[in-house]
């Protein structure tokens, strides 16, 4: 590898000692029988997705697993391992489905960014240099990833698929997106 390539990788926290690798994972499918305001359990498809994710993660050295307190996230995380840390800051963005079918967000993106950033920072600091799995929710993840990519809110036209892996590398106050939407475990 050339010196230029090593420098480029270091700039993106690839192969840098002490980097914490946070796997930000969207929960598995839960939409069978979901009603507005519900905290649904995983659907049969979601349980299969969670098991495929668990098979992938079990091959890795994982320092800890964190989850939103919502049932769909907890069930996904507990399919991987029994020992799951719950963090309320990982909850979904507050929203409702409007009359015209559009989403009506009840929580400002700045609030989501603040709580998600604080959660990821705290988790990364607690497991410095390790790999951590964080199971959360689609809209909150999009807002957080949009912020990390330095895009304006609404400019990341991407919906993480169920159990997709989004890798964020953290070192000190630096957070770099390494992977978006990896679903190779579902193939």
PLM regions and their residue ranges:
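Phosphate-handling substructures
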Residues: 38-44, 78-122, 178-180
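Generic beta-sheet signal
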Residues: 22, 122, 128-139
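Active-site-proximal alpha-helix that buttresses catalytic centers in soluble enzyme cores
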Residues: 2-84, 108
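Generic structural signal for well-ordered alpha-helical scaffold segments
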Residues: 51-58, 113, 117-125
């Amino acid at each position: 590898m050339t010196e230029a390539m090593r420098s480029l990788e270091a700039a993106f926290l690839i192969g840098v000692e002490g980097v914490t690798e946070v796997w930000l994972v969207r929960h598995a499918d839960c939409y069978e029988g979901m009603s507005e305001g519900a905290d649904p359990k995983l659907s049969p498809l979601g349980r299969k997705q969670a098991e495929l994710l668990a098979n992938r993660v079990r091959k890795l050295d994982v320092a800890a697993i964190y989850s939103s307190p919502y049932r769909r996230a907890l069930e996904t995380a507990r399919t991987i391992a029994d020992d799951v840390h719950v963090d309320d800051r990982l909850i979904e963005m507050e929203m409702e489905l409007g009359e015209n079918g559009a989403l009506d967000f009840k929580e400002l993106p700045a609030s989501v960014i603040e709580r998600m950033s604080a959660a990821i920072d705290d988790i990364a600091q607690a497991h410095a240099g390790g790999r951590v799995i964080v199971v959360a929710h689609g809209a909150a993840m999009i807002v957080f990833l949009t912020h990390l990519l330095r895009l304006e809110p609404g400019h990341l036209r991407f919906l993480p698929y169920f159990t997709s892996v989004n890798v964020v590398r953290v070192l000190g106050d630096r957070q770099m997106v390494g992977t978006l939407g990896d679903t190779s475990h579902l193939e």
